[in-house]
Amino acid sequence: MEAIINKLYLQESLTEQESQQLFDTIIRGELDPILMASALTALKIKGETPDEIAGAAKALLANAQPFPRPDYDFADIVGTGGDGHNTINISTTAAFVAAACGLKVAKHGNRSVSSKSGSSDLLDSFGINLAMSAEDTRSAVDSIGVAFLFAPQYHSGVKHAMPVRQTMKTRTIFNILGPLINPARPNIELMGVYSQELVRPIAETMLKMGMKRAAVVHGSGLDEVAIHGDTLVAEIKDGVIHEYTLTPADFGVNTHPLEAIKGGDPEENKAIITHLLTGKGTEAQLSAVAVNVALLMRLFGHEDLKANTQQAIDVMNSGKAYQLVEKLAQHA
């Protein structure tokens, strides 16, 4: 371990194996907190490489509680958070809409770090059981098409890093690991990142982790596909990363100001999402969710973004996605 940490002091990058070893020690609670802070700081200042991120993610997955992985194609749709814009819960809402469009989604999430209402805060407000067993969660993905894995239930070892992270009060590699350590191990993923500098490295990380098809996005300041500006995309297809830019027009929607999709506290967000999923959403809110669902549908082989967007809007207006929220609340 000393050799690994000394390497970081010299601002040298770790191999994937070394990073996995370092994070295995952290997750088991075997690394002194002062050394942990030093290692996290050194990684942050140097800039984490895809090898280092993949190694850390593999360590966390290896130490996670097991989950009965489906043998069919299924996805996660998730953002790193931390973009500082406090929009409505787009990826959580999109998970239900995607399921109503026929996709399978096992969404990994946590309590809110920086926004007023994280995905679990919202699900809580709908009466969805965040402590559902792995078996019940898996059966929800099978039968309803969507379920939610609450991070602390599967990644108990992350608690060893919490005091250090809270004291450091700055972003570390842990801020980008969440979306990469879904214990269900989906083979398809749409992941939003808080900075465009992360788009390519995270796509390279996903490639190293064996993701079948995925897209990493940053939308003009948001960790989602944007309707207020351009979205930078790095898409993994057939083992190759394709980078491109999408505009609202590519989805057949109008451009809307960021203000139009502002969120609030969990109760306000619950009201907004209920409206959205029962045909009473605003054009901007519907578009914001639909463009994210549309890109996720592309990852399942439905290539026409405009048709996908329209299908997602129709599903929201029909109330079909809201029925899935109710089903999941009754599931366990």
From Swiss-Prot:
<dbReference type="GO" id="GO:0004048">
    <property type="term" value="F:anthranilate phosphoribosyltransferase activity"/>
</dbReference>
<dbReference type="GO" id="GO:0000162">
    <property type="term" value="P:L-tryptophan biosynthetic process"/>
</dbReference>
<feature type="binding site">
    <location>
        <position position="79"/>
    </location>
    <ligand>
        <name>5-phospho-alpha-D-ribose 1-diphosphate</name>
    </ligand>
</feature>
<feature type="binding site">
    <location>
        <begin position="82"/>
        <end position="83"/>
    </location>
    <ligand>
        <name>5-phospho-alpha-D-ribose 1-diphosphate</name>
    </ligand>
</feature>
<dbReference type="InterPro" id="IPR017459">
    <property type="entry name" value="Glycosyl_Trfase_fam3_N_dom"/>
</dbReference>
<feature type="binding site">
    <location>
        <position position="91"/>
    </location>
    <ligand>
        <name>Mg(2+) 1</name>
    </ligand>
</feature>
<keyword id="KW-0057">Aromatic amino acid biosynthesis</keyword>
<feature type="binding site">
    <location>
        <position position="110"/>
    </location>
    <ligand>
        <name>anthranilate 1</name>
    </ligand>
</feature>
<keyword id="KW-0028">Amino-acid biosynthesis</keyword>
<feature type="binding site">
    <location>
        <position position="223"/>
    </location>
    <ligand>
        <name>Mg(2+) 2</name>
    </ligand>
</feature>
<dbReference type="InterPro" id="IPR035902">
    <property type="entry name" value="Nuc_phospho_transferase"/>
</dbReference>
<keyword id="KW-0822">Tryptophan biosynthesis</keyword>
<feature type="binding site">
    <location>
        <begin position="107"/>
        <end position="115"/>
    </location>
    <ligand>
        <name>5-phospho-alpha-D-ribose 1-diphosphate</name>
    </ligand>
</feature>
<dbReference type="Pfam" id="PF00591">
    <property type="entry name" value="Glycos_transf_3"/>
</dbReference>
<feature type="binding site">
    <location>
        <position position="224"/>
    </location>
    <ligand>
        <name>Mg(2+) 1</name>
    </ligand>
</feature>
<keyword id="KW-0808">Transferase</keyword>
<dbReference type="InterPro" id="IPR000312">
    <property type="entry name" value="Glycosyl_Trfase_fam3"/>
</dbReference>
<feature type="binding site">
    <location>
        <position position="224"/>
    </location>
    <ligand>
        <name>Mg(2+) 2</name>
    </ligand>
</feature>
<feature type="binding site">
    <location>
        <position position="87"/>
    </location>
    <ligand>
        <name>5-phospho-alpha-D-ribose 1-diphosphate</name>
    </ligand>
</feature>
<dbReference type="GO" id="GO:0000287">
    <property type="term" value="F:magnesium ion binding"/>
</dbReference>
<comment type="pathway">
    <text>Amino-acid biosynthesis; L-tryptophan biosynthesis; L-tryptophan from chorismate: step 2/5.</text>
</comment>
<keyword id="KW-0328">Glycosyltransferase</keyword>
<feature type="binding site">
    <location>
        <begin position="89"/>
        <end position="92"/>
    </location>
    <ligand>
        <name>5-phospho-alpha-D-ribose 1-diphosphate</name>
    </ligand>
</feature>
<dbReference type="GO" id="GO:0005829">
    <property type="term" value="C:cytosol"/>
</dbReference>
<comment type="function">
    <text>Catalyzes the transfer of the phosphoribosyl group of 5-phosphorylribose-1-pyrophosphate (PRPP) to anthranilate to yield N-(5'-phosphoribosyl)-anthranilate (PRA).</text>
</comment>
<comment type="subunit">
    <text>Homodimer.</text>
</comment>
<keyword id="KW-0460">Magnesium</keyword>
<feature type="binding site">
    <location>
        <position position="79"/>
    </location>
    <ligand>
        <name>anthranilate 1</name>
    </ligand>
</feature>
<dbReference type="Pfam" id="PF02885">
    <property type="entry name" value="Glycos_trans_3N"/>
</dbReference>
<dbReference type="InterPro" id="IPR036320">
    <property type="entry name" value="Glycosyl_Trfase_fam3_N_dom_sf"/>
</dbReference>
<comment type="similarity">
    <text>Belongs to the anthranilate phosphoribosyltransferase family.</text>
</comment>
<dbReference type="InterPro" id="IPR005940">
    <property type="entry name" value="Anthranilate_Pribosyl_Tfrase"/>
</dbReference>
<protein>
    <recommendedName>
        <fullName>Anthranilate phosphoribosyltransferase</fullName>
        <ecNumber>2.4.2.18</ecNumber>
    </recommendedName>
</protein>
<feature type="binding site">
    <location>
        <position position="165"/>
    </location>
    <ligand>
        <name>anthranilate 2</name>
    </ligand>
</feature>
<feature type="binding site">
    <location>
        <position position="119"/>
    </location>
    <ligand>
        <name>5-phospho-alpha-D-ribose 1-diphosphate</name>
    </ligand>
</feature>
<keyword id="KW-0479">Metal-binding</keyword>
